[in-house]
A protein has these predicted regions:
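Helix-loop boundary and gating motifs at the non-cytosolic
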Residues: 1-42, 190-199
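Hydrophobic core of transmembrane alpha-helices in multi-pass small-molecule transporters
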Residues: 3, 71, 82-98, 197
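Intracellular juxtamembrane helix-capping segments at the cytosolic ends
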Residues: 16, 97-110
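Transmembrane alpha-helix termini and helix-breaking/packing motifs in multi-pass membrane transporters
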Residues: 22, 46-54, 131-151
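Loop-to-transmembrane helix entry/capping segments in MFS-fold secondary transporters
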Residues: 28-29, 112-122
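C-terminal ends and interior cores of transmembrane alpha-helices
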Residues: 66-79
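Glycine-rich segments within core transmembrane alpha-helices of 12-TM secondary carriers
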Residues: 117-136
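C-terminal membrane-cytosol helix-exit motif in multi-pass small-molecule transporters
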Residues: 137-141, 156-175
Length: 199
């Protein structure tokens, strides 16, 4: 799943400015609004705590991953202001909720001794996938002559496919420790909270 996020997000990010200007006739104002809308789900990511009352973390992660993929997949089909705003919010909800859950899941499933090494590998897989995705986008445009719609669809579809494969292959990991279902804030972590909020 670590490689699935960059397939969609790197595709969306790499193509966004050119797509917005060339196809949706965006100006600086619309780009500013789009970027603001993209960050709203990030501010609301604490809402994951409430979803935990309804769904397991693994289910939330898979749904979020699929939502990220769907948002990216349909972006190219909506080359207008409202279409790009809506697809961006869909993609962003998936991205931010997945990122919120994946760290928690990783720390639950990994042994404490191996967690730093494995988390480093997970980040490396994501970075490598981003680089490969950027290369594939370049090949798709320059060598294959594909357009925005097809490239967005391929990037998003790859993420959705990975989410579906993970849902079928790993239906339910055992939960060793029961997860808290309430928001816990500790005064001593104020700096971490502030930096996370500002990021």
């Amino acid at each position: 799943m670590a490689g699935a996020v960059p397939l969609s997000f790197a595709t969306w990010q790499a193509l966004l400015n050119n797509f917005a200007i060339e196809r949706a006739a965006f100006t600086g104002i619309e780009i500013g609004v789009l970027q603001s809308l993209r960050e709203i789900p990030g501010f609301l990511a604490f809402g994951v705590v409430f979803l935990l009352f309804l769904l397991r973390e693994q289910s939330i992660a898979l749904i979020s991953l699929a939502l990220l993929g769907v948002g990216t997949l349909i972006t190219g089909f909506f080359p207008n202001v409202m279409g790009l705003y809506i697809t961006t919010v869909i993609m962003s909800v998936g991205f931010h909720y997945y990122e919120t859950i994946q760290t928690s899941l990783s720390l639950q499933w990994l042994d404490k001794d191996k967690a730093p090494e494995v988390l480093g590998r997970i980040i490396a897989v994501g970075a490598f996938t981003s680089i490969v995705t950027f290369g594939m986008i370049w090949l798709a445009f320059d060598l294959a002559g594909l357009g925005f719609t097809v490239v967005y669809a391929l990037g998003g579809a790859a993420t959705v496919l990975i989410a579906l494969i993970c849902a079928v292959s790993f239906p339910q990991f055992p939960v060793k420790i029961r997860q808290h279902r309430q928001l816990i804030l500790r005064k001593r972590y104020w700096l971490y909270y502030a930096l996370t909020f500002l990021s």
